[in-house]
Amino acid sequence: MQSRVLLVTALLVLLASARATEGEDPSLLGLMQGYVQHATKTAQDTLTTMREFPVAQQARDWVTGRFSSLKDYWSTLTGKFSGFWDSTFAVTPTPASEAK
């Protein structure tokens, strides 16, 4: 009889602890959501602050200038090669077509 009472008591304790664990999950989820929202806001604030620094503006201007220079170089290079390819693949009459 005592073993049955002990078994029932153990099952009730397990059931009660399972219920207690279920109660903690939503609060843990809420805690994690709050943490993620706080981290997101902090990151956005930091990026906004970084955009306001003169050094960041200088870096953006430098990158924009270098990218523009690279685009100019690329268009010059492709212009030279496109002329080369156009002249190479020009249609030249073959001796058989001249004989007709």
Swiss-Prot record:
UniProt GO cellular component terms: chylomicron; intermediate-density lipoprotein particle; spherical high-density lipoprotein particle; very-low-density lipoprotein particle
Coiled coil stretches, renumbered: none
Keyword tags: Chylomicron, Glycoprotein, Lipid degradation, Lipid metabolism, Lipid transport, Secreted, Sialic acid, Signal, Transport, VLDL
Location in or out of the cell: Secreted
InterPro entries on file: Apo-CIII, Apo_CIII_sf
Recorded GO MF terms: high-density lipoprotein particle receptor binding; lipase inhibitor activity; phospholipid binding
Record-level GO BP terms: cholesterol efflux; cholesterol homeostasis; chylomicron remnant clearance; G protein-coupled receptor signaling pathway; high-density lipoprotein particle remodeling; lipoprotein metabolic process; negative regulation of cholesterol import; negative regulation of fatty acid biosynthetic process
Site (May interact with the LDL receptor): 41
Signal peptide as annotated in the record: 1-20
Post-translational modifications reported in the UniProt record: The most abundant glycoforms are characterized by an O-linked disaccharide galactose linked to N-acetylgalactosamine (Gal-GalNAc), further modified with up to 3 sialic acid residues. Less abundant glycoforms are characterized by more complex and fucosylated glycan moieties. O-glycosylated on Thr-94 with a core 1 or possibly core 8 glycan.
Ranges where the record places region Lipid-binding: 68-99
Glycosylation sites (chain numbering): 94
Family of this protein: Belongs to the apolipoprotein C3 family.
Primary role: Component of triglyceride-rich very low density lipoproteins (VLDL) and high density lipoproteins (HDL) in plasma. Plays a multifaceted role in triglyceride homeostasis. Intracellularly, promotes hepatic very low density lipoprotein 1 (VLDL1) assembly and secretion; extracellularly, attenuates hydrolysis and clearance of triglyceride-rich lipoproteins (TRLs). Impairs the lipolysis of TRLs by inhibiting lipoprotein lipase and the hepatic uptake of TRLs by remnant receptors.
Protein name (database record): Apolipoprotein C-III
Species this protein is from: Panthera tigris altaica
Biological classification of the source: Eukaryota, Metazoa, Chordata, Craniata, Vertebrata
